[in-house]
Amino acid sequence: EFLQVIQNRRTIYELSKKPILADDALVQYIRQLVKEAPSSFNVQSSRVVVLLGDQHSKYWNEIVPRAVSASVSDEALETMRPKLQNFAKAYGTILFFEDEKLIKTQQEQFPMFASGFPTWSLHASGMAQIYTWTGLEAVGYGANLQHYGNLTGEMLKKEYSLPESYRIQSEMVSVS
């Protein structure tokens, strides 16, 4: 059964806003999936912010284009705009972060392993992402993974009053 769910998990770009779970249930489900993902020394440094409704639309229609425009020409942004607008048609976006404060604490607590914690944090983030993607597939959602966070990370911290120690890893666009 698990193997079948993994085999069914694919990148889905045909986007819709059709809900499968109630918003509260979906957010709780995603948080539980991330919590169950293994992490080195059980650090549990992965964090998610789930954007639904207007916040999801704002991310793809305002925040990402504003961030991209600071890095590319207007012409390049206009070429990208249809892709970003397509992501806005999805049901929601899951922002994956790693909490660097927890990683630093582990480095201080276990100095002999200090150099490994940043890498292990990335492993944990990847596991949280695949657990989430596979878990969404299991209940009928599709998804695709995006990487605009290197451009939007600081804006997101301000927009959602996130801790300075949060480092964005990816965005998962979820569809039904």
Residue ranges of predicted features:
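Small-aliphatic-rich amphipathic alpha-helix that forms the alpha element of a beta-alpha
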Residues: I30, V34, E100, Q109-K157
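Active-site-adjacent structural patch at catalytic or cofactor/ligand-binding sites
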Residues: A90-K101
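Conserved hydrophobic/aromatic beta-strand scaffold that supports enzyme active sites
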Residues: V5, T93-L95, E171-V173
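A glycine-rich helix N-cap at a beta->alpha junction
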Residues: V68-S71, L84-N86, E159-S176
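Short, conserved acidic/polar surface loops in the N-terminal third of protein domains
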Residues: W60-E62, K104-Q109
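N-terminal amphipathic, basic helical "cap/leader" segment at the start of enzyme domains
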Residues: E1-G92
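Short secondary-structure junction motifs
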Residues: V43-S46, A138, Q169
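Short, surface-exposed loop/helix-turn segments at secondary-structure junctions
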Residues: A67-D74, E108-F117, Y160
